Swiss-Prot record:
Keywords for the protein's UniProt record, in alphabetical order: DNA-binding, Repeat, Transcription, Transcription regulation
Lineage: superkingdom: Archaea
Entry function: General factor that plays a role in the activation of archaeal genes transcribed by RNA polymerase. Binds specifically to the TATA box promoter element which lies close to the position of transcription initiation.
InterPro entries: TBP, TBP_archaea, TBP_CS, TBP_dom_sf
GO molecular function, one term: DNA binding
Alphabetized SUPFAM superfamilies for the sequence: TATA-box binding protein-like
One BP annotation, GO: DNA-templated transcription initiation
Key word Transcription present: yes
Family assignment from sequence similarity: Belongs to the TBP family.
NCBIfam families: PRK00394.1-1, PRK00394.1-2
Repeat positions for Sequence: 25-101, 116-192
Organism of origin: Aeropyrum pernix (strain ATCC 700893 / DSM 11879 / JCM 9820 / NBRC 100138 / K1)
Transport listed as a keyword: no
Protein name: TATA-box-binding protein
């Protein structure tokens, strides 16, 4: 099983008569805050696979191949991580990075603080959707098909933004925890059923 496939999760919405949607975490953006400042010149000389061009960008760019994740490292001790596909993978990357620092004698003090900034996910409800009907029933939604083919739905709880397409495909952004993604998909499936906006099962 490839790394891509392993991050697809089938969830049970509890909605009778509907297939189980597939949900995939596409990208997690997180900041990691260390308690001490970092010597970026030292890191550049000690760690492989880093790019540091302070004239172009104030941070150091560290690219990992497995998992395929990018880390921006700043002198202040702040790091920005993009590309993780799960919280567990994100934590693994942080541990891997701190171990690389320790192995090369780069000082790190205290325990890092990890803050999730955004989780982006895709989902397939495996149904066809009447977006006009959904737009009438969904509060805080926008559907202007002449400008964009999907319905934009701003959910209050969990606080996420969803792009919903007539094919049953969706994009979810703004989540801070993986469970918020799954809760949002379950909730929107129920709302679509209640709105009578599901017009067929996708094969």
């Amino acid at each position: 099983m490839s790394e891509e496939i392993s991050f697809v999760k089938e969830i049970d919405t509890g909605v009778e008569g509907l297939p189980k949607p597939e949900v995939k975490i596409e990208n997690i953006v997180a900041t990691v805050i260390l308690e001490n400042q970092l010597d970026l010149n030292l890191i550049e000389t000690k760690i492989q696979d880093v790019d540091y061009n302070p004239d172009q960008f104030p941070g150091l760019v560290y690219r990992l191949e497995s998992p395929r994740v990018t880390v921006l490292i700043f002198k202040s001790g702040k790091m920005v991580i993009t590309g993780a596909k799960s919280i567990n993978q994100l934590i693994h990357v942080v541990k891997k990075l701190l171990k690389a620092f320790a192995d090369q004698g780069i000082p790190i003090s205290g325990k890092p603080q990890i803050q999730i900034q955004n989780i982006v996910a895709s989902a397939n409800l495996k149904v066809y959707i009447d977006l006009e009907k959904a737009a009438l029933e969904f509060e805080n939604s926008l559907y202007e098909p002449e400008q964009f083919p999907g319905l934009i739905y701003r959910m209050d709880e969990p606080r996420v933004v969803m792009l919903i397409f007539s094919s049953g495909k969706m994009v979810i952004t703004g989540a801070k925890m993986e469970n918020e993604v799954y809760d949002a998909v379950k909730k929107v499936a129920r709302k679509l059923k209640e709105a009578d906006a599901i017009i067929g099962i996708a094969e």
